[in-house]
Amino acid sequence: MILQILIYVSSLLPIMHQTNAQSTLKLEISGLKNNKGFVLIAIFNSELGFPDKKELAVKKIRIPAQAGVISYDVQDLVPGTYALAIIHDENDNQRLDTGLFGIPKEGFCFSKGAMGTFGPPTFQAASFVHKAPNSSQKLQIKYW
């Protein structure tokens, strides 16, 4: 009986390894209007904190801004459901600057091109499934 249990458990090890395997999320961010500041990327795996509580993101990335298109590979991301919130932080103050009525002064975007009616989209609207070994997201920065 013990031998049968050991054989069964050992047959599950490859499956268990695959579900916890780290993989790469390839990002292509386009539409940046200049080289000022940084692009801030927050990756969330639940609606908790999405999109503005970056301290609750599973990964936070800061890369130099580059007009046009930026390609970036997020390494070691466990397969699962995620949503991205991205800001072109032109003045490097680590937040999205807004003006009258909360209208953004800096560029921003969300995964799947999601947009809210009056404010940011929900996690569900922006979420996508990241699968091993790699997946990709194309994102377009928007300015008002």
Which stretches of residues belong to each language-model region?
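Bacterial Sec-dependent N-terminal signal peptides
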Residues: 1-24
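A short tyrosine-centered beta-strand micro-motif
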Residues: 82-86
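A short, amphipathic beta-strand motif
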Residues: 25-32
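Contiguous segments within soluble domain cores/interaction surfaces
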Residues: 32-56
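A glycine-anchored, Pro-Gly-centered beta-turn/N-cap motif
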Residues: 68, 73, 78-81
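Acidic, glycine-anchored loop motifs typical of Ca2+
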Residues: 90-96
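Short proline/glycine- and polar residue-rich coil/turn motifs
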Residues: 62-68, 130-132
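Extracellular beta-sheet/turn segments enriched in Thr/Pro/Gly and aliphatic residues
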Residues: 107-143
